[in-house]
UniProtKB/Swiss-Prot annotation:
GO cellular component, one term: cytosol
InterPro entries registered for this protein in UniProt: DNA-bd_dom_put_sf (IPR009061), EF-G-like_DII (IPR053905), EFTu-like_2 (IPR004161), IF2_assoc_dom_bac (IPR013575), IF2_II (IPR044145), IF2_N (IPR006847), P-loop_NTPase (IPR027417), Small_GTP-bd (IPR005225)
Protein family according to the UniProt entry: Belongs to the TRAFAC class translation factor GTPase superfamily. Classic translation factor GTPase family. IF-2 subfamily.
Protein name: Translation initiation factor IF-2
Amino acid sequence: MADLSVKQLAIEVGTPVDRLVQQFKDAGLNKDADAMVTEHEKQALLEHLKKQHGADNAEPKRMTLQRKTKGTLSVPGAGGKNKEVQIEVRKSKTYVHRSVIDEAQQQKEAEEKARQEAEKTRQEELAKAEQARKDAEAKARKEAEEKARKEAEARKQSTEAAADDAAKSPDEKARKVKAEADKRADENAKREAEALRKKQEEEAQRKTELEAQRKTELEAQRIAEEARRLAVENEGRWAAEEEARRRAELTDDVGEAASKFVKEAEAERERQDESKGRRRTGVVKAKKSPHEEAREERNSRARKGKRAKVHTPNSMQHGFQKPAQPVNRDIVVGETISVGELAQKMAVKAVEVIKVMMKMGAMATINQIIDQETAQLVAEEMGHKVTLRRENELEEAVLQDRDSTATREGRAPVVTIMGHVDHGKTSLLDYIRKAKVASGEAGGITQHIGAYHVDTENGSITFLDTPGHAAFTAMRARGAQATDIVVLVVAADDGVMPQTVEAIQHAKAAGVPIVVAVNKVDKPDADPDRVMNELTRYSVIPEEWGGENQFVKVSAKSGEGIDNLLNAILLQSEVLELGAVRDAMASGVVIESRLDKGRGPVATVLVQEGTLHQGDIVLCGFEYGRVRAMRDELGRSIDAAGPSIPVEILGLSGVPSAGDEATVVRDEKKAREVALYRQGKFRDVKLARQQKAKLENMFANMTEGEVSELNVVLKADVQGSVEAIADSLNKLSTDEVKVRIIGSGVGGITETDASLAAASNAIVLGFNVRADASARKIIESESIDLRYYSVIYDLIDEVRQAMSGMLAPEYKQQIIGLAEVRDVFRSPKFGAVAGCMVTEGTVKRNSPIRVLRDNVVIYEGELESLRRFKDDVPEVKNGYECGIAVKNYNDVRPGDQIEVYETVEIQRTL
């Protein structure tokens, strides 16, 4: 706020100028009417006025509020009549000013600080005393050593002198006496030095203990004084708390007094029942009522000095009356709801809801999630009124809180290159970009959506390169939805192929104009006219023939017709009048996403509206986050990206799904809430859409256990490849073998993936990714089948072979020989023995046989004996005679035929 003069301030606060000047003067500020007043001077004046009027002591430090609530309590009385009892409930609540709490906290901190300082001082004193004791000991030891050294020197000198005297004197006895005297003198000197040292040590220790005791007594006195001061200060607060506790006890006594009438009524009724029973059955032993027993127990506890609440049972009569007719309710149903929650809203048992659903043809459990439409039908069937609720109000509010008032400007067209596999889409784009991208694609085919921004002489164009393989249908559809113009590439030597037709269908479904590029016109067998004729069958008619589609003949190898193609694209964009808001919050679509090992989740976003800046908060499907970094298609860091510009963004919470809308929002907290709501909604809707266990398909569910399953853990480098491969593998499933993808994701193969594959007996497929060291260790120890691929054809073919190996084998009976019965003989060992001539193939003894009579099978069994002459033989070939005994069959007649066959296993394929 700008500074004001005294006169202006007086007008603003509504006081006379003279009075305001006097107040400034009282506050120690000399001001006249025209002087300027600063914020600091205003604050000083305000503090002076507060002190003058006693504002510091005006507000209370503690306030107690008392509340009385009056009501009535209906209790049963004598004769079955209810009696109204007036009751009053008193409550009190004490509020303490924040300054009191702050002062107590500051006081506590000061006490703790003083205690720490005292402890520190005591430790320092103890350390000093210990150091002094050590110094005294060292000094005493040094003095004793010095004294002993001097005495030793003196003794040595005296000993030498005595030795000289002894040498001179012939008296040996005098020398010995002198030596003993020296020895005693040495010992006396040592004892005196030791006694002196001990005395000095004891004196130093005594001084240290006295000093520590004095410090401890001083600290105890200070703490006692502090406790007395706190007791004096908190005496009022403790009194208020005691008063509040007393009032609470008084309230409990009032409640007990109010319930006294209930207890007395119960006792009166029980006494009446006892008197009636006594009149009917005679004398009955007197029995105390529960109220009397409770009263005696309470009195006994009161005598012991203990206070306890006694809970007495109320009347056994139910207060609930069954409704005379069904109650129709107004219920609110969200987008998904469980059967149990729906039953709770309708106030019925869940079993009743399940019965109604079974009558309507659907089976459900109590915890099963059902959709909004099903819940509405069930509730209306049971007679309730249903209100449908939208749960995405927060999401709509967040997405509508955007800048949309800016003017629209022209933008570059977004062009998608589509066509059949290996028709030259990426090579055509390479020539335009002057970069060799096709060589970087595995197998020479595009397996990702590549987004590129190209600046030409006539304007800028953004290209999206889509795959042509059949497995990448979703990626092509995604590219068509995010584009303005579709360039349909058709090889002049190959013509219209299945993916060409599919690309036309995607473009027409998205309502996008098509520009046809007839590629490979430089080949000798190129036939552009045939391509034009074939495309007319799919409503793609050249302008030369009266249609709306431009046809351009190009060669991605030589560059022929490239400029004409770019001019055709720019001409088509001018017709469309493309525009976008540039100075606004950005929005776009996720073209591709992946998990980078060093950078985390990376999403390729095509900006469609506004400008995306580094640091913006992006809501993208189930994920959200702040844009930490942005890179263009060449890997260069950029700070902003306008409309029709593809960028890679880093900073999302997870890998978004390709095709999700990316929107810049204002609040990161709300973005997180919307993302979590979308995740929960997706999970509930997925559960609600699962196939319901209806009565008519129960038998089909019973036979599912016979189907073999191939468990697969799939990891790829980008999200689009995961979707395409998973869709292709699911399409390989048959009635006998099913592909079950138990785990899929973006990024390298981790230890978790390997553990999952080991637990579920699955194979691990890696598409342009590799396993880390920990995962390889588990794969080797568990003998898991791990395979790497870089081309989708190889992956699908090998999975198909693995599924073929899981098919149940097929068995076929193959006839290997035929013998005609010429005569029948009798044998005591075998019974009837047929004398036969082998007419076809070979008759083998261990093979099963059939007996035919008039070309009709009359018996099926096995041979018991096969002989030629009298020798047992393993087989008899065509043109030879033999004797055949059929096991457990004696009705063989001449003219019968014995057919020999074997069962052959045939391996099946998908």
